[in-house]
Each structure stands twice: as C-alpha cells, then as structure tokens.
Amino acid sequence: MLFRSVAVLMAEGYEEGETLTIVDLLRRGGLECHTFSFNEEFVRGMHDMYVKADKLFNGEIKNYDMLVLPGGRPGGQNLLENQDVISLVQYFNEHHQYIAAMCSGTVVLEKANVIKGKKVTGYTGYQDKLVSGDFVNEVAVFDQNIVTSQGPATPYPFSFKILEVFGKDVTEMKEGLMYNFAGGK
C-alpha cells in the first residue's frame, strides 16, 4: 500500500478538539500527518491552547495527498480570508487531490468553488453558506475528492472517513478506542 500524507492547516483560533483529534487519529491510522501554521511556530486555539505546529505554511503542502481544514472561531474565518489557502484548495481540487474540511472550515470550500454538484455537510445552519454543494445532514460525507463533517463533536467519524478514503480498515481502531461502546457508529 502506498504511504499517504495529510497536511492539516492551523489558523489562529483553530478548534482544538477538532484539530488535535484529527491529527491523533490519522497518525494512529498510519498516515503521515503534519500540522502547518501561517506565521508563528506556536498557534493559539479558540480556547487559548497554544500548540506547536510541525511546519510553517509553504509550497511543500502541494506534495501532500490531502489537505485538511479544521474549523474554529475565528480559525475557520481566518482560513476563509487567506487567499493563499483559497488558492491551495483550488490547486488540490484541480490536481484531483483530496480535500477535507469540517465545521466552519467548510465555507472555504464554497469560496474556492470546489463543491459544485458534490455532497457536503457542515456546521448546523451552514446550508445557506454551502449553496453550490448538495448539502446533506450527515455526520461525515465523502464525495469525489471532498470529505466534510459537521462540528466539534464529529472529528472521530470525520477522521475515520478520511482513513477509509485511503483504504484503511478502521474496525480495530474503533474497538481499541471504545468508539462503538461510547455510542459511535
């Protein structure tokens, strides 16, 4: 099996629970997963947790198999307002690379114009913000090259969906994490 790599963007105000859970589960699942910050080595999350990013945002990201956009306030908005992020999302889409976004990070996909005709989901009430996609009320959705999820309570199913996109069987991981026991499906 090919080795797969994932780049997770950490904008100031990122949602810690989403971001750190995603990174943890993808690494447990055997993917090469790196976090990227924009200006500083340490990035402040929306609940004032400072986390050291693995790398600074650069052109190297284009070599990754997947780009992940977590949410957060103002993390999602900071991603949305960054033209380099919009251009990177468009690049990934044009080159048929995977893009994953959750919560407020999903609006970046709309602005980048990469979800037209694709099933997507996002934070509660985001139907009006994801108008070019086919909004569905599901926890995690994969359509063509796009993975989306709803919000702070959904990074587990989101991460499992990403692992499955890369051909990973998550059955044992779910058992080891007691995910099904805790009510996960």
Task: Give short role names for the model-derived ranges.
Residues 1:
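Extracellular interaction modules
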Residues 21-22:
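Short amphipathic alpha-helix
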Residues 35-47:
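Membrane-interfacial amphipathic helices and adjacent loop/beta segments
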Residues 46-55:
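Short gly/ser/thr-rich secondary-structure transition/capping motifs
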